[in-house]
């Protein structure tokens, strides 16, 4: 069970709505994934309606919004500050989310530049601390630097969310050692965020010790979102079970292979016995 800021979720998979090509495909993917928490950029929200049915850029005019869809499916909304590049903008966005959606949860994103979409870790830690002081439960998107991850935890983050690789690249986990180190040192949930391309990436994240995986593009931009969402659901669970089971130690060529069965009792040719028989 995944627990963040005192709230428990059966699913360890968090979905994103970015990149969805249609509301119908998004709904099918969300249902197939089994997710109970999904992140939505606050820039999708239209002021004037705090019922969760505000219009969004991903829905047809007059149709159901992403917020309405999540509400109908019983999925918790995790508003994010996607697109923000300063502490001031991120804090304002978080405040608007709390007012509009009635939640003090926020996924904090502070982007350094539009080309790489890498997080601005210098601004990130201070912003996290300010949001925590205002009563927010901050889930902080960060780099795969273990030092920054620890500083975010010290600043009060409810969860740290290191990237596997840059957003939308599908490159998987480029630095598994750092992700494993972040997990080993953390006392809050570590959620892999960004860079997942296929199910094996999600499984690896869990094997490295992550508490959960957040992904969007890998599902929403693939050829069959519902099928990929199903694959991700099973991959996260498989990785979690494998981590709990404990993998066997890896052996180098110098150490040699290790037989799974003893050589004791192995049949061998006996000349004396052969002469008697033959």
From Swiss-Prot:
HAMAP family: ThiG. The gene is thiG. The lineage of its organism: Bacteria, Bacillati, Actinomycetota, Actinomycetes, Mycobacteriales. One of its GO terms (molecular function) is thiazole synthase activity. PANTHER family: THIAZOLE SYNTHASE (PTHR34266:SF2). It comes from the Bacteria. Keywords: Cytoplasm, Schiff base, Thiamine biosynthesis, Transferase. The keyword 4Fe-4S does not apply. This is Thiazole synthase. Its main location: cytoplasm. InterPro entries: Aldolase_TIM (IPR013785), Thiazole_synthase_ThiG (IPR033983), ThiG (IPR008867). It is found in: Cytoplasm. The active site is at residue 107. It is an enzyme of class 2 (transferase). Catalyzes the rearrangement of 1-deoxy-D-xylulose 5-phosphate (DXP) to produce the thiazole phosphate moiety of thiamine. Sulfur is provided by the thiocarboxylate moiety of the carrier protein ThiS. In vitro, sulfur can be provided by H(2)S. It comes from Corynebacterium urealyticum (strain ATCC 43042 / DSM 7109). GO terms for cellular component: cytoplasm. GO terms for biological process: thiamine diphosphate biosynthetic process. Homotetramer. Forms heterodimers with either ThiH or ThiS. 1-deoxy-D-xylulose 5-phosphate binds at residues 168, 194-195, 216-217. Belongs to the ThiG family. Pathway: Cofactor biosynthesis; thiamine diphosphate biosynthesis. The keyword Cytoplasm applies. It catalyses: [ThiS sulfur-carrier protein]-C-terminal-Gly-aminoethanethioate + 2-iminoacetate + 1-deoxy-D-xylulose 5-phosphate = [ThiS sulfur-carrier protein]-C-terminal Gly-Gly + 2-[(2R,5Z)-2-carboxy-4-methylthiazol-5(2H)-ylidene]ethyl phosphate + 2 H2O + H(+). Its EC number is 2.8.1.10.
